[in-house]
Structures are given as C-alpha cells and as structure tokens.
C-alpha cells in the first residue's frame, strides 16, 4: 500500500493541500466511487463540515448529513495505513481542549454527524491523526469572519457580527506544515487554535473603515470559541494553550498583508 489519497480535494483546503503535496488520487463528490476497494499508504480526509464552513452548512444541514452518510458507506471498503483527518472543533466545548469529552447532543444533527464520522474514521483505520479547526482564513470561500469582513460592500448598514464574540482565526497557509509537524512529534489529536480575537478587535485593527458600522454588544451575543491545545508548545514557545498569539493573528490579517 503505497498510493496516497486526498478526500475532499475540490474544497478550498483540499485545493491548497494538493498544490503543496502530490497525491495519487484526488477525490471529491464527483468521483467518490473510485474509493471502492482501494488500499492506501496514506490518506487525508477533509470532513464535509470544512468544505464550506460550519455557519453556511448549519443553515441547510441536509446536504451535509447526506455527504457524511455516503462517506461512511464508502470508507467501509477502504484500507489505509495512515490517515490524517481534518474536522470541525464544534464537537468540543467552547473552552475545551483535545482531552475534553466530545459534545454528543443527539438532538443536534450537525454535532451528531460530526461525532459519528470522527468515531467511525478512528475505529476503521489503525493510525489516525485528528486535527480540529474552527475558522480558517485565506480560503477565499468565506470560511472566517475575517474573510466575510474583507468582502463587505460599501455602505452604512450595521455589520452582521457580534461585537465581543471570540474568533480563533487559523491561517490556511500553515496547514500542511502543522500537520506534518504533529506526525513527526507522534501526536494523534491536535487543536489548531490561535489565541481568540473579538469581532471588535478584528475590525478595529484590520478593517478600521468599518468601525462605525459595528453593532453594540448584546447579552444574547454568542460566546464564540476559546478552545486551547495541550500540545501548543510544539508550535509556539510560550505555554499559553494557543499555537499563535493574538498579535501574530492580527498582523497576518492587517490591510497591507491582504492587499
């Protein structure tokens, strides 16, 4: 088993990954049947939850649920010596880490499907490295509040953001390097979580022309994400629980970096 496969190759993360590393098989929704009976030395599986971004999918979960079911059915017929699985961190509590019990809320079809797919992949294949992401920047697919703010049309309308909601903005350009480092370190579950920034901090420092369009803080505003990683020191020297500090996150999103 020496062939390699990237499952989810046509989404933003998959296109980026395949531009950095060679795969024998590039698999997406159009050719999933190629997986039947295949054996791979290595496979990268990108969860359908990260193909558009969780916010968009939650607005219409039916296609996502169908994708999960189809993927599980096909993966029953696949063998792989080593699997890298990229999935949503929504299955962890808002302040959780890799050791936190997963949220198994059966009444929430989105979370239930995420947990079902993660559990299946880890039981099906022998060596699996799980990566958890929340917001991803630089995809061009609106998968983070930063990308959405960058695309806001001119006007005076109030921004559709929660002022103090916490966002963990992971830059896509780090992904391949961070994954390979985890394999080198022998880690098998990693939260790729930078220090959170609020919508207010993000707009103030990276999109100052939008400051006057910010809403006021409301009691009903969501908390957001403040997950940490018990392995953060493998990526960032200070033992903060984050793989990047807030200053580096904001610097990478500054107007001159985006132009």
Model regions: which residues?
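N-terminal Rossmann NAD(P)H-binding glycine-rich loop of SDR-like oxidoreductase domains
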Residues: 1-23
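Short, solvent-exposed loop/turn segments at secondary-structure junctions
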Residues: 10-12, 47-53, 89-92, 128, ...
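Active-site regions of enzymes building and remodeling cell-envelope glycoconjugates
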Residues: 21-31, 39-45, 59-63, 97-102, ...
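NAD(P)H-binding glycine-rich loop region in Rossmannoid oxidoreductase-like domains
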Residues: 26-98
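Glycine-/Pro-rich loop/turn segments that contact NAD(P) or position catalytic residues
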Residues: 69, 76-140
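Conserved beta-loop-beta element that borders a ligand/cofactor-binding pocket
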Residues: 115-165, 188-191
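A conserved structural motif in NAD(P)-dependent oxidoreductases
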Residues: 168-174
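Mid/C-terminal beta-alpha module of Rossmann-like enzyme folds, strongest
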Residues: 176-233, 237, 241-259
